[in-house]
Amino acid sequence: MLTSYQLESPALSWGEDGAPHSNQFDDVYFDKESGLEETRHVFLKNNQLSGRWASLQKNAFVIAETGFGTGLNFLCAWQAFLTEAASDKQLHFISVEKYPMTKSMLTDALKMWPSISHLSQQLIDAYPEVCHGLHRIELEQGRIQLTLWFGEAEDGFAALDADVDAWFLDGFAPSKNPEMWSDNLFKHIHRLSHQGTTFSTFTAAGIVRRGLKNVGFDVRKVKGFGQKREMTVGELNSSTAPLSARMSQGQAWFNLRQDKTSEITKVLVVGAGLAGANTAYALAKQGIKVEVWEQGNCIAGGASGNPQGMLYPKLASQDTPVNRFYLSAYLHATRLYSSLDRHKQFWDACGLIQIPKNDKEAVRFQKLLDEKLYPEAILQASKDREGCLFLPLSGWVVLTQLCETLLSHENIHVCLNTKLESLSPIELDDKTFGWQARSKYQQAPLNDRQACFSHVVLCTANDTKALGVTPKTPDYPIRGQVSFMDIEKAKAACQTIGESADKIDFDKILCEFGYVSPSINGLLHFGSTYDLKDLDDRVREEGHKRNLAILESLLLLPKETFNSEDCGGRVSFRCAVPDYTPIVGPVQSEDVYQQAYSTLTKNAKWQSNEIAEPIKQLYINIGHGSRGLISTPLSGSYIASLITGTPSPLEQKVSHKLHPSRFIIRDLKRSQIL
C-alpha cells in the first residue's frame, strides 16, 4: 500500500548549455542541439503520425509514453497535431513519470526551446501539483488532453483504462534504468493496444525488443537519428491483439466495455445541477452536441444552487481507492475552476482551515502532518490557528455562476421546465441504437428527431428512482439548511458584546462541525444542517440557531452572539449514498446481473469471466452528497470518456468503487437478491 502521496523530484544538474541532466540515472533528458529534431524523427516520423492524422476517421487519437521528463515529446506531438489533423479531432496523450519535475524545473528546462514557447507556457500554467496518481490536463479548449501518471510506470499502466494507437517508448537508456522495462510493463503495453497499434523507441536494446516480441508486437530495427546507428519500431499484429483494453481487470461485473457501433449524434443530459453541468461541459468540449433537460425553472435550482459552496476534500490518513478518487477530483476541480474564472468572478482559491472537532481528530491531524502523507502544496499546518490543518488550494465558488458558465458552451442547449417523463429504447435506423425521451412539459411526437438521442446521462440526484429506468440504488436525501447574515449586522453584534468586528473580516474558509466562508456581496454564508429523514423544504428558525452555534464556535465567539432573526436561509436536499461515494458509470440491468452472477449468493469469493453487458448507451452520475463541487468535474469527464471510448481520467480500481453495479454485486454476495 502507498505510504505517501509525496514523490521525489529528480536530482538535476544543469550543463553549461542549460540542458538538464539526471543525477539519478546519469543521463541527459535531451540533446540541446537536436532535441526537437530527434523527437520528431524517433517518435512522430517512425509512428507515421503525419499520414495517420491527416486521414484520421475516428474522433480521437491516443498516444502513450514511458517517461514524461520535460514534456518535450508531448509538446512536439501537440504542435504537429494542430497542423496535421482536422480541427474536429482530439489528441489524447498519456505519460508516466516516476520523478516528476516541479513547475520551476519544467520552466527552466523548456526555456531552451523558444520555437514552442507558446505551447510550453500553456503546459507550465496547467501543470499539476507533484502528487502521486493520475492527473488530467485539458488544453486548446479540450482538443488536447494530457493524462499524467506520477509514480512507477508499471503501476501507472496497470491503473490505466485506455485504447492506445501509438507508443512513445522513451525514458533513460535501458542500461541505466532496467527496472522500468519489466515483463509486467510489456504485458500492460499489450493490454492497452489494439490491432495496428504502433511503437517507436530510440533504443535497440535487447531487453526492449524481446519484451515487445514476447507480447505479440512485430519488431524491427531501423536507422536511428543522427549518429545513432539503430532504433526500434513495430506494430501489434492481429493474431495477438487483445479483445478490449477497456475490459475490467479481475472483476467482470465492473466491465466498462460497450458496443461502439452506434454513432454519437446528440446526448441528453438530464439535470442542470453540478453533475449535469459538468457532464454536459465535458461532452461539449469533445465536439458533441448536448441537450440538457432541467425540470426546474432555472439552472442549479436544487442542492447545487446554494449561494456559496466550498471545496472541502476531507483527506484521509490511509491510501484507499475512494481517497484516491477524492484527491484526484479535488486537484482536477481546482484546475478547472481556475481556468474557467481567471478574473475571480465566481471562484476564489482563498484556502481552507480545518479545525479538529475533538481530541481524537486533533491526534489524526498531527499524524497526517508528521507522516507527510500529502505534499505541502496540498496539506500543511495552519499558521493562523494552532493544531489545525490548512489546505491552500481550497476555495469557494458561486454555484449558480459556475453552472451557468459550464452550460454556456456553444455545443450545449438547455431546456428549462422540462421534466423527463419516460425513456424508451429505439432503433434510429437499421444499425443505430438510441433513446426516445418524452417530457411532461414538451410532449414531442414519436417521429420528432429532437426527442431522439444516441446516449442519455441521468444526473437526476434524488429523482432518479422515480424514473424507473435504473436498478434500485440505495441513495437517499439529506436535508440541509444554510444560513446567511448581513456582514454589517454580524460586525455590530460582535461590537455589542465587546468583541472586535475584525473577527468577521477573515479571508479563509473555516471548517469544523460546519463551515463559514469569507463574505460575498455583503453577506456571510454559514452552515449547514444535516437532517436525516426530514423532507421539510421550509427554512426553519431552529436550523438558523444550529448554524449560528456553528458560526460562533468557528469564530471563537460566545454563545448567542448572533440573533436568528437576522438570518436568511435556503433549504435543499443532498443526494447521499451509504458508502459516501458517488454512483457514476454505465447503468446495469438488475435482471441480467442476477442471472449472470447468481453464484455469488452461494460463494461470495466466486470470480467470473462472463461479461454482463450494461444497458446500451445509458449512464448515471448521482450521489455526490455535500462534496459535489469536488467530485462532479472529474465524474463528468469520466462519463464523457465512457461515451466516446477515450482514455479514462480514473484509475480502474477507482472506477470500480464508483460503478453503479457495486450495489447489485454487494446484495448478491449478501444473498439479499434471490
UniProtKB/Swiss-Prot annotation:
Residues 270-674 are annotated as: FAD-dependent cmnm(5)s(2)U34 oxidoreductase. It is found in: Cytoplasm. Gene3D superfamilies: D-Amino Acid Oxidase, subunit A, domain 2, FAD/NAD(P)-binding domain, Vaccinia Virus protein VP39. Residues 1-237 are annotated as: tRNA (mnm(5)s(2)U34)-methyltransferase. It comes from the Bacteria. GO terms for biological process: methylation; tRNA wobble base modification. One of its GO terms (molecular function) is flavin adenine dinucleotide binding. Its EC number is 2.1.1.61, 1.5.-.-. Keywords: Cytoplasm, FAD, Flavoprotein, Methyltransferase, Multifunctional enzyme, Oxidoreductase, S-adenosyl-L-methionine, Transferase, tRNA processing. One of its GO terms (cellular component) is cytoplasm. Transmembrane segments: none annotated. Its cofactor is FAD. It catalyses: 5-aminomethyl-2-thiouridine(34) in tRNA + S-adenosyl-L-methionine = 5-methylaminomethyl-2-thiouridine(34) in tRNA + S-adenosyl-L-homocysteine + H(+). Catalyzes the last two steps in the biosynthesis of 5-methylaminomethyl-2-thiouridine (mnm(5)s(2)U) at the wobble position (U34) in tRNA. Catalyzes the FAD-dependent demodification of cmnm(5)s(2)U34 to nm(5)s(2)U34, followed by the transfer of a methyl group from S-adenosyl-L-methionine to nm(5)s(2)U34, to form mnm(5)s(2)U34. In the N-terminal section; belongs to the methyltransferase superfamily. tRNA (mnm(5)s(2)U34)-methyltransferase family. In the C-terminal section; belongs to the DAO family. This is tRNA 5-methylaminomethyl-2-thiouridine biosynthesis bifunctional protein MnmC. It comes from Marinomonas sp. (strain MWYL1).
